[in-house]
């Protein structure tokens, strides 16, 4: 079986222009039927990869979030090798004294001046195609100034569920996709 795959790969490279080698007697046995099979397998591979990529990008978009009585909008986008979620709008951006709300509980003092409508909530999540979830990242809770592990998944087409957890303790919330 392995020899067949090696020969097939070699022949694909030669016929696709990968190598400019003279045809040998064994390669002349490659028939149109064999080429159709090879092309069909390549087409299936391309479709499978593109389908998986489309599924991983399903998380990208804008979401409405209601948490602790505060409504906000969050944008999820590709960032590096994973995805990031950042606040883009908060319904109560100004405090009662007229000053802007900031990330004042952030343990990193250099980030305490970040406006509430610019806080990065989720970072470095990646798609796990086997389990149809986004994991391996962190979620930040600006109300507590704490960061947790995170797992995200869809419940239907428009509801993104996320679970922030530390060991066996977790909290699950929902974001509603608005575009």
Regions found by a protein language model. Give the residues of each.
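Central antiparallel beta-sheet cores of small beta-barrel/beta-sandwich binding domains
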Residues: 60, 65-66, 71-140, 147-148
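Bacterial N-terminal signal peptides that target proteins for export
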Residues: 32-41
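Short, exposed beta-strand-loop hairpins at the edges of beta-sheets
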Residues: 160-167, 171
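Bacterial N-terminal signal peptides
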Residues: 42-49
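N-terminal helix-cap/turn-to-beta initiation motif at the start of protein domains
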Residues: 53-62, 170
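Acidic, glycine-rich flexible loop segments
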Residues: 137-162
